[in-house]
Amino acid sequence: MKMKKFVLRSFLLATLGCVAFTSMAQAEERVVATVDGIPVLESQVRANMGKKGDRQSAIDKIIDDILVQKAVQESGVKIDPREIDHIVEDTAARNGLTYGQFLDALDYQGISLNTFRQQIANQMVMGAVRNKAIQESIDVTREEVVALGQKMLDEAKSQGTAQKVTGKEYEVRHILLKLNPLLNDAQAKKQLAKIRSDIIAGKTTFADAALKYSKDYLSGANGGSLGYAFPETYAPQFAQTVVKSKQGVISAPFKTEFGWHILEVTGVRDGDLTAEAYTQKAYERLVNTQLQDATNDWVKALRKRANIQYFNK
């Protein structure tokens, strides 16, 4: 239990390392700066200086945190309590604790459950406000992603560190009915159910039905076949149906953004996802770089609008 408490303590220190606004009861403590009238106290600076003892960096960090907290408070963003419940439960589980043990561990650290929940809520709101402020500034093109992904893959190969990534490719055929003024959801679903029944009963074949009825004319001319592809290349609902379908079994009618479908998985094989994996890594690197830059720019913008005063800097 002591080890679990130590692990949890480390987690709490990392998770809840937000600015602790010092009680105004410490009236005799020296004020080193103010941010829109909010004081920055000497004890806060000492608590944030760390081993390097960089006083100015500590003051700037506190000021930035105050500005972000103000932006959060002014945003009006609300967090669903159920989301906080989930995070609390997940935190306990990841630390190998029951809910009761987790509460005991919090108490051991001198932290009430309400305080812990409020800290989580503050961080979630802060993230939402920040993301809303900077999301429009993120601009990553497909060309940039592909080029960087290929460069990263080539470097990994030359260094002998490239690892092959595989995933399931599915061979799929489908029949699509598109909605129109003469065909609503109920009618399309009913028609596809009838087509499915006829195929299963042997009254027609999937290929013939696709050629006759499918509004995906390209695949319809090929018996409804879409060939082999990774599920991620399809619309979400289509991909989900592909993955959960048993090979050789025609799915029930389902709807996507394109219309109503039935599909059949006719083959499964392992495909090479190595290039795609490095493309994803490249995308994450580019986005994270821009995100950090945008975050810094956002905080700088908050500073420009704020009234910041230093005393005995």
Curated annotation (Swiss-Prot):
Source superkingdom: Bacteria
Molecular function, one GO term: unfolded protein binding
Enzyme class: isomerase
InterPro entries (alphabetical): OMP_Chaperone_SurA (IPR050280), PPIase_dom_sf (IPR046357), PPIase_PpiC (IPR000297), PPIase_PpiC_CS (IPR023058), SurA_N (IPR015391), Trigger_fact/SurA_dom_sf (IPR027304)
Keywords: Chaperone, Isomerase, Periplasm, Rotamase, Signal
GO cellular component, one term: outer membrane-bounded periplasmic space
Span of the signal peptide: 1-27
Enzyme Commission number(s): 5.2.1.8
Domain (PpiC): residue spans on this chain: 167-267
Signal keyword on record: yes
Disulfide pairings: none
Keyword Isomerase part of the UniProt annotation: yes
Pfam families hit by this protein: Rotamase, SurA_N
Membrane spanning residue stretches: none
Catalytic activities: [protein]-peptidylproline (omega=180) = [protein]-peptidylproline (omega=0)
GO biological process, one term: chaperone-mediated protein folding
Function, in words: Chaperone involved in the folding of extracytoplasmic proteins.
Protein name: Putative peptidyl-prolyl cis-trans isomerase SurA
Species, as recorded: Haemophilus influenzae (strain ATCC 51907 / DSM 11121 / KW20 / Rd)
